[in-house]
Amino acid sequence: MRIVAGIARGRRLRAPKGRLVRPTADRVKEAVFSILESRDGCAGLKVLDLFAGAGTLGIEALSRGASEAVFVDHGRPSIEAIHANLETTGLVGEVLSMPAERGIQQLAAAGRRFDRVFIDPPYGEGWIAPTLTALDAARLVADGGLVVVEHGRGEAAAPEVGGLVQQIARRYGDTHIAVYRANERDEDEHGNP
């Protein structure tokens, strides 16, 4: 695993110890960021990396100029790998050691919003739909923001989840990528998005 582009290009990243984490392959990561580059990239944007694993997607976004990145994972080996990878690359990110659902709730309670969200849960465990639903309900994705979901063969990514509408679906071997765009929403009577 390595950083593909940006200020930390070529740096090797550490995978979490154990066999429970499946880091995003470099060729899939290159394809994801090629899609994002065609849609204003990541420079100056706020990024959320859920089920972060080694943090490769969020760290790649930081290397490409994202203004901030928050990494959420509850596995100790993953948290250790994210910290080590941030140190190796000299990049700075916020690391939350908790399940994705709790991370979404905590970030929403703090009024945070993100322009790019990466969701890369363990394949075949049914995390995609509830995570997209929680993201939409919490309104963590800024209007026009993009959510990139990585999933395995045989898992479905719904065409629409609330205000998140699938724009792109691609397949790279056994890995599938779905990219959602957050529709603009009106504020409620209290001025909240």
Stretches found by the model and what they are:
Residues 1-193:
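Class I S-adenosyl-L-methionine-dependent methyltransferase catalytic core
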